[in-house]
């Protein structure tokens, strides 16, 4: 989105503001910076990466967001190759026909690499995007504004629709029309995982979209036994409002049935 041009000469703070420091925002920031634009990324979280994420708890490590990354453009292929050369990513041959890229030693290493050298403001939440005379203002929850000639918003569509609603209703309506497939994920720290499958488990007939023994991932730093289970989109949509305890119990049962292995 770009601001209208008139005779006002208020200079913007940046050529480009990017809302969101997930993979899309980081990739856009790298390309804009390479093209010579002054750029700033703003993210409400304390870490970059968005859904390419890793969580640590009591020595356990869980890659609980996107499980791997694929590249479909030359630019992103080049970025992942650079991350691999730097030791922050590596290949994973999921099957003979599917080779993907994962973070090393964890998934969040990839966005960490992509963020290197980019100006990013973390823990700052934008409340709305406002059209000004000669720029666009991104106004945060404290009422402070950052100004730019152009803005890229990579936030999830429902959040984007809210940010755009006051001054960009047509764009807001487009964003609001997007639909999402939910994914209920559980993370289990175990006493022993050596008996669990060492390859990803896909069992849609048992409502399991993905399950992985974290210590069996290649390029991994996890040493404590841990299991991440992600439900299918259909099951997740039907059970999104279940309590945590209910979801955990049901997904453990489904995993045990699908894998033939006991968890615990």
Language-model region placement:
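Central helical "cap/lid" subdomain
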Residues: 49, 145-201, 261
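Core beta-strand elements of the Rossmann-like FAD/NAD(P) dinucleotide-binding domain
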Residues: 12-14, 141-150
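Active-site substrate-recognition segment that forms the wall
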Residues: 187-240, 246, 250-260
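N-terminal FAD cofactor-binding segment of flavoenzymes
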Residues: 31, 53-91
């Amino acid at each position: 989105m770009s601001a209208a041009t008139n005779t006002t000469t208020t200079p913007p703070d940046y050529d480009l503001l990017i809302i969101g420091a997930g993979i899309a925002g980081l990739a856009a920031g790298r390309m804009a910076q390479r093209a010579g634009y002054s750029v700033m990324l703003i993210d409400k979280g304390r870490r970059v990466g968005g859904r390419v994420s890793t969580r640590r708890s009591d020595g356990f490590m869980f890659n609980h967001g996107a499980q791997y990354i694929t590249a479909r453009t030359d630019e992103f292929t080049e970025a992942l190759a650079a991350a691999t050369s730097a030791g922050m990513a590596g290949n994973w041959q999921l099957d003979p026909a599917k080779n993907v890229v994962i973070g090393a030693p964890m998934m969040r290493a990839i966005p960490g690499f992509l963020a290197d050298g980019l100006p990013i403001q973390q823990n700052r939440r934008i409340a709305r995007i406002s059209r000004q005379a000669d720029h666009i203002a991104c106004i945060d929850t404290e009422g402070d504004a950052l100004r730019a000639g152009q803005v890229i918003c990579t936030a999830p569509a429902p959040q984007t629709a809210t940010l755009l609603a006051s001054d960009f209703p047509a764009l807001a309506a487009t964003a609001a029309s997007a639909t999402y497939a939910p994914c209920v994920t559980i993370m289990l720290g175990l006493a022993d995982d050596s008996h669990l499958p060492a390859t990803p488990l896909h069992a849609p007939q048992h409502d399991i979209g993905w399950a992985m023994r974290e210590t069996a991932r290649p390029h991994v730093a996890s040493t404590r036994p841990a299991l991440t289970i992600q439900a299918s989109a259909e099951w997740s949509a039907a059970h999104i409002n279940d309590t945590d305890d209910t979801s955990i119990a049901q997904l453990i049962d489904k995993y045990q049935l699908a894998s033939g292995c006991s968890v615990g």
